[in-house]
Every structure is written in C-alpha cells, then in structure tokens.
Amino acid sequence: MSDSYVFSSPIIIHPGSDTLQAGLADEEHPGSIFPNIVGRHKLAGLMEWVDQRVLCVGQEAIDQSATVLLRHPVWSGIVGDWEAFAAVLRHTFYRALWVAPEEHPIVVTESPHVYRSFQLRREQLTRLLFETFHAPQVAVCSEAAMSLYACGLDTGLVVSLGDFVSYVAPVHRGAIVDAGLTFLEPDGRSITEYLSRLLLERGHVFTSPEALRLVRDIKETLCYVADDVAKEAARNADSVEATYLLPNGETLVLGNERFRCPEVLFHPDLLGWESPGLTDAVCNAIMKCDPSLQAELFGNIVVTGGGSLFPGLSERLQRELEQRAPAEAPVHLLTRDDRRHLPWKGAARFARDAQFAGFALTRQAYERHGAELIYQM
C-alpha cells in the first residue's frame, strides 16, 4: 500500500474529558457523542477490584454504576489510563461508528494541556492508533486551532469552557501563542459542585455521583449568567424562580441560585480562589501577546465548550471586554449555535482540506522513523 493510496473518509475524534465526539469528516455533525467513561468490575459490598478489565463504556457504564467502578480515561484533557482509552476507542470504532479503523485516516484533537506539559502523550497516542488499530494515517490537531478553523479563522482567541478543562488560548496562524495560554480554575465540575452547595443551603442534599449528575442537568437546564448580578438579585423573587421535576416526582424550585451558580466564572473568589475571572483572563491573555496581534485577537474571540451555553454569558463577556479593550481594538465574539462541537467540526473541515495529506503521518513514515515524527507534522 503506497502513501498515495486513497482511503475512506477520515475518522474525527474529539476526546473530551467528559464527552467524546466522533464521526466521519464528510459528515456535518459528529455521528456519535457519548460519555468518555468506562466501568470496571467491582466486588459488591467490599468495593475491591476483582477484574481490572473494562466491562462497559459510555452511557452503559453510567447505567451500571451500582455494580461497576466508573473511571474517566481522560482527565483534564490528558489520557491517564491507556487501557481504558483503548477500550473507548474500540467502542468508538466498532460499536458507535461501525467502521474499520484500518481503512480510514484517524484525526484526534489535542488539549492545550498536552501541548504545554505532556507531549509524550502524543507519541503514545500515535503508537496506539498505528499498533493497536492499524490506522493507515494519523493526525493530531490542536483543539484550540480547530475551533478557530471551524469558523474560517487561523488567528484569534479561543475561550473554551469545558466540564474538566477551561482555558483561554491565543492562536496565531494555527499555532498556540504559549505566552498567552491560560487555564481557568472554574470549570464545569466546580460550577456543578457550587450549585449543589447552594441547594444544600436550602435543605436539598445532592452529594453522591449520581446526584451530582442530576445537579449538572439542573445547571444546564435552568442556570444563566446575569448581566448585572446586583440588579438581578434585586428583582422580585418570583420573576427569577424556575422549577425542575426530579426523578422521584418532586418539584425543585430554584431562585437566585440560577444566576449565582455560573457567576463563579467571572468571580472565582466565590469559591475562595484567587485566580482571575473570565474577563480578566481574556484580557490578560491578549495583553501577553505581541502588540501587533492584540487587535486581531480582540476582534476574533471564539467561545466554545458546554459551559459557553449559559444564556447571557456571551453578552456579559462582550460588554465587560468592551469596557476593558483599547479603543483601537473593537471586540467581536463569535458564539455559534454549534459551539459545543467546534473542535470536532474544525478537525473535520481540516481533514477535507487539500493540505491535510501533507499534515498526516502515514503508516510507512511511522514504520521508517517512529512515533517521534508526529511532532514534525
């Protein structure tokens, strides 16, 4: 098989710490989206591991949480359990997408955490895809750059608000500007946990993993970002109340928790943290970049990730940035309806591009030079 062999449509995988998105590059949307989690067998009652093999993946693992130990193979954007991640990939190829990985180039997005501190993970991923799944070609792409690429950009600022990882990443001509790369302390999990604390103040106990998954759904269904917290708090209580039907049939009423919860994105001090809030982090990241880039970064801010879906978040961030940005740098936020899937969509678009063939590492090159060649691609 020569390097010029024409393969089937590339498989695109965005392995988020919480959710994995996968599909073929010629599709408009990810063909499969499922929890990036595995279940391992446990001995009921003693909580001891009997067999370390992965028994189930994704929603099936969550559904069997009473009888299995749940583990995330990817944590904060970094693969920490390669055996479990291989099981997730097998599930992706053979059960979720029904494809033969040896017939498709495979494109995987990469978290900025890997870019900055864990680059050897890229070699491990490359070996896994070639040796275990016999991929004909492999490409590893920056998820931040792919988020921009989905919007037709190669330079801009990516604000990614995920469940396990949130960051601000300046990108110039497809490459992360390391000086401005900033990881945010508040992420989706911390916001969910904060909401559970607020509910506890009202006598509602949600502390188990199953209960926290319910709190997460409450957060995603009812919470929003207030444009002005003081004014929102002064409103009539009835005007901000909303109800949520619990699985047991009871009705949960939320009041100011709806906007107090995501406020930690802008004010991490609510959690006792001294890290900068979202607006400060964006401004600081841009100002750490070359002055010649700053206006372009302010003008091309792409917001992505599940946490970006809070109603009111983009409007609040736009307003606060306009108050902080230099007069010669108009602020423009791109908040697409499909922003949760931007890294996947950008990678799919890139895989359809003519330049992809020169970017992907072929099996022949891998066998001649090894996995280290992935750094040159």
Swiss-Prot record:
Disulfide bonding pattern of the chain: none
Domain of life: Bacteria
Induction remark: Constitutively expressed.
A Pfam family the protein falls into: Actin
Alphabetical list of Gene3D superfamilies matching this protein: 3.30.420.40, Actin, Chain A, domain 4
Family designation: Belongs to the actin family.
Reported function: May be a dominant-negative inhibitor of eukaryotic actin polymerization.
Protein name stated in the entry: Bacterial actin-related protein
